[in-house]
A protein has these predicted regions:
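Alpha/beta enzyme core
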Residues: 2-233, 240-242, 246-247, 251, ...
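Flexible, glycine/charged-enriched surface loops at secondary-structure junctions
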Residues: 148, 255-264
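A short, charged, Gly/Pro-tolerant segment at domain boundaries
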Residues: 261-278
Length: 278
């Protein structure tokens, strides 16, 4: 318990430091160990990455138990704090969200993402009053467990292009402000990519903001200047790895050569990485 409390406290501090918190998302123990070894101060899981790796589509098609089993293996393997992407909480009720928060803590993670997209209706968001109840349930469960779980509350207004584009920003601010008031430590609006809107959001909300970055996004130095607290890469890290495997396969089939294997870590390096687990 004391170790989890200390990790949660240190993870919380990373959201308010001078340096922007960088989270290249992981999907298994090997990817988590690689990110830790590369010097990152925390590890964030990708729900889509884990789902894809186990043969499921994204969108809560994987069970809570399957997702948390992977998260637990990751949390046990690394020394740094782990934050878990648990989609919409694997259930439609505040009680479901609370149970998922407990499972996240029991798995050894000290942070979690909670989104307002509905897996069975990808173009519909959870009604705001219900989403606020879910956030409060997570906060209450964390309090009962005496673990200062860092909650990153997400709206998919931009990612799913919900509603009238002219009203999207204002509705995003309304939702994220309410999430913050309900107990979220950090807020998240994936799909935002242009610097002026990101800067405006930081100024309007005045709280830690997570940006999902990728090709076309402002660079990390630019995001830092805008006041962004946290940058994650989502499932792109896992998908890029799949892209590497695709290039290996295509080269082998087309030319019978192996140049795409040149950057692979050695067998000894991989063994050493696995042996240094806590």
């Amino acid at each position: 318990m004391a170790q989890e409390q200390a990790k949660a406290a240190s993870f919380r501090v990373l959201h308010s430091g001078r340096e922007i918190l960088l989270l290249p998302n992981v999907w298994d123990v090997a990817s988590a160990l690689l990110i830790e070894e590369s010097g990152f101060k925390a590890v964030a899981t990708s729900s889509a990455g884990i789902a894809f790796s186990l043969g499921y589509p994204d969108g809560q098609r994987i069970s809570r138990e399957q997702m948390l089993a992977v998260i637990a293996r990751i949390a046990k393997a690394v020394r740094v704090p782990v934050t878990a992407d648990v989609e919409a909480g694997y259930g439609k009720t505040p009680e479901d969200a609370g149970r998922t928060a407990r499972a996240v803590a029991e798995a050894g993670a000290v942070g979690m993402n909670l989104e307002d997209a509905m897996g069975d209706s990808p173009s519909v968001l959870v009604e705001l009053p219900l989403q606020l109840e879910k956030i409060r349930a997570v906060r209450e469960m964390a309090s009962r467990l005496r673990i200062p779980l860092v909650l990153n509350a997400r709206t998919d207004m931009y990612l799913l292009q919900i509603g009238d584009p002219a009203e999207r920003y204002d509705e995003t601010v309304r939702r994220l402000s309410a999430f913050r008031e309900a107990g979220a430590d950090c807020v998240f609006a994936p799909g935002l990519r242009d610097a002026p809107t990101i800067g405006r959001l930081v100024a309007d909300l005045k709280c830690p903001i997570n940006i999902l970055a990728g090709p076309g996004s402002p660079s990390v130095p630019e995001l830092s200047k805008l006041g962004v607290a946290r940058v994650s890469l989502g499932s792109a890290t896992m998908r890029a790895t799949v892209g590497c495997l695709r290039r290996i396969a295509q080269e082998l089939k087309a030319t019978g050569t192996y140049s795409n294997l040149e950057d692979a870590p050695s067998h000894a390096e991989m063994n050493r990485m696995m042996e240094r687990k806590p």
